[in-house]
Amino acid sequence: MKPNYSVNTSPKRSDEPIWWGLFGAGGTWFAMLTPITVLVLGILVPLGVIDAEAMSYERVSAFATSIIGALFIIGTLALPMWHAMHRVHHGMHDLKFHTGVIGKVACYAFAGLITALAVIFIFMI
């Protein structure tokens, strides 16, 4: 008995795993690290729980120019943007705004632009 399916020997490759990877990384970053960052920088330092001297220009500049600080700042800006733009792209499709390749390119190009600007601005410090 012959199976009733055929295997495509030259399947079309999708670029979707790349976008899903950035989407997942951005969502994880936004869910786990952004609330801590907002808590520390937006609540604890202004309330005086953390000494304001810890956030002096010299210390923040030294952190931002270190490799771990630069990666943290780039990750904080870039990864959630990839997550958001992936959601916008698929949300437009769900709402029946079929923008095709132009919408996909616009969403991911914007996320790429924000990523590039984050890297450029870190090197400008």
Swiss-Prot record:
CDD domains: QFR_TypeD_subunitD. GO terms for molecular function: succinate dehydrogenase activity. The gene is frdD. The chain crosses the membrane at residues 30-50, 62-82, 105-125. It is a multi-pass membrane protein. It is found in: Cell inner membrane. The keyword Cell membrane applies. GO terms for cellular component: fumarate reductase complex; plasma membrane. This is Fumarate reductase subunit D. Anchors the catalytic components of the fumarate reductase complex to the cell membrane, binds quinones. SUPFAM superfamilies: Fumarate reductase respiratory complex transmembrane subunits. Keywords: Cell inner membrane, Cell membrane, Membrane, Transmembrane, Transmembrane helix. It holds the Pfam family Fumarate_red_D. GO terms for biological process: fumarate metabolic process. Its main location: membrane. Part of an enzyme complex containing four subunits: a flavoprotein (FrdA), an iron-sulfur protein (FrdB), and two hydrophobic anchor proteins (FrdC and FrdD). InterPro entries: Fumarate_red_D, SQR/QFR_C/D.
